[in-house]
A protein has these predicted regions:
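Ribonuclease/tRNase effector modules and their secretory precursors
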Residues: 1-188
Length: 188
């Protein structure tokens, strides 16, 4: 029937048609529906991560400014690719983004919830820039590692942590290239 079943693929396809001025008939309605489904899926992920403090509703009531920030970031998030050189992909998806931001970004600190985690001494907007810088700097090493160990996690911890601008950063990357952890471990 020519229908695309994967919501994200269908949404991107209709977005592309919109940019190419090829939108026809039900395409606008399809795009609205696909965007609504995407929004629901993303908010469900956020709800799951916040269930330890009573869920998204309670979080929003108790911390309205923080809720606005993380909801906006969640809904606007686009997957980041950190390398264009090399055959092995390095990227950050929504799950990795939420893991990093909810645990390690000071502006999103919630009393008693991941509060023991090391926080970036950066503005929220600068965290993304730092991650990008570190991942690009590690790309060559990552490519060599991935060729040698295709099924192992790439890790930088403790003595092997990456040094950048006076701080050391620990990270973990899944075999498929997905960044799943990134945090500051102390001053140099």
């Amino acid at each position: 029937d020519g229908q695309i079943n994967n919501n994200e693929v269908a949404r991107i396809f209709v977005e592309w048609k919109k940019q190419a001025n090829c939108v026809k008939g039900d395409d606008r309605k399809t795009l609205l529906n696909r965007n609504f489904i995407r929004m629901q899926e993303r908010l469900a992920k956020l709800e799951e991560l916040l269930k330890g403090i009573g869920g998204l509703k309670r979080f929003s009531e108790k911390y309205p400014q923080k809720a606005m920030l993380i909801i906006d970031k969640t809904l606007r998030f686009h997957q980041h690719r950190y390398n264009v050189v090399g055959k092995h992909l390095l990227y950050l998806d929504l799950d990795g983004f939420l893991h990093i931001y909810l645990r390690h970004v000071e502006e999103l600190t919630i009393a008693g919830y991941y509060s023991e985690r090391t926080k970036f001494q950066l503005d929220e907007k600068d965290v993304e820039i730092t991650i990008k810088h570190v991942m690009k700097a590690l790309n060559e090493e990552y490519q060599v590692f991935r060729d040698k160990y295709p099924d192992k996690q790439f890790r930088k911890y403790e003595d092997d942590a990456y040094y950048c601008n006076g701080d050391y950063y620990a990270l973990r990357v899944e075999p498929d290239g997905r960044l799943i952890q990134f945090y500051k471990i102390g001053k140099g």
